Structure formats: C-alpha cells, structure tokens
Amino acid sequence: EEPDMILFTGDLVNNQASEVEPYLDTLRQLHASDGIYSIWGNHDYCEYGNNHSIGALKRNRRMLYGYQESLGWHQLMNEHHVVSHGMASIAVIGVENPGQPPFTNRSNLKKAMKGLNPDMFKILLSHDPHHWRREVVGKKIQLTLAGHTHAGQLKIGKWTPARMAFKEWGGAYRIGEQMLY
C-alpha cells in the first residue's frame, strides 16, 4: 500500500521510552506521501514506571520525542499542519492528551487551531474520546480520531468492559456533521 497520510493517536509505549527500540526498524518502513502525524497518549508521558523522579520523566519524554523525530513523524503538540494539493487543503490538528482524572489534561484545542481557516476540512487527533463530547462537538471539526480505550484488547461478541467507562469506546460515532472514530 502507498498511503497518503498516516495518523497515530498515541500510546506508542507503555511505561518508558526504551520500549519502542525493538520496533524502530519496523516503524522506519512506514511512509506516506503527505506525512506521518503523531500525538501523545497518556502512556507516552512515561508516568507509569517505577521511577517517577522529575529527571527520569524528562529523560523518557525527550527520548520518546527524539525517537519519533528520527522516524520523520510530525508530532503535533497542540498545533496543526495544513496539507495542500492544488486548491484543496486539509488541516491535521493534534492536541496533547486531553485526559480526565486521574490523567492530566494537557490539551489546548484553541491553541492548536489558531490561524486556521474556519471553512477548511479538519481532522483532529485527540487521544481520549471523552474530549470529543467535552470540547469538540459544535466546533467546525469534521473528523476526530481517538484511541485510549483499548476496546480491542478484550471483547466477547459485541460486549467489552470499555463500554462501562466510555460512551464512545470503538467504531464510528456521529453528531450532525461531525464524526469520531
């Protein structure tokens, strides 16, 4: 396949940045003509390991940022990138993890959208699907892509424990002209 764009919604690692090292050669094989865009999920901030010192957290975050940078990924940290082909343009917007307690809310959607044409087609990368109803619905963002729920890790038929914690836990959801997937 030759994708135009690859969009990644976070949780590249679980506890520490070094977990990605065995997969770097595989990840280097990913290519997309219009780029690979990434946001960070709650695990990417490396707050779940045994060493919670400020130094260890900063070191892990720098390492993870560096790994993704070395792969050529565009890490969208409350910012956007416009992809244009002729007269058509799409804005890829990325926010940092918009967590709900116990997770830290690091997102700043207003900052991420600053300067965008309101009529442009927009794709938002937002790790936590709660963010969609909480802040995105009603704004001119046509498509939001989220992760976080891990719904595919345990599913029996159509039942998953993710349904108890998330109204939107997997698949496509629509309100008016806006969609979450």
Residue map of PLM features:
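Soluble catalytic domains of enzymes that build or remodel membrane lipids, polysaccharides, and related
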Residues: 1-181
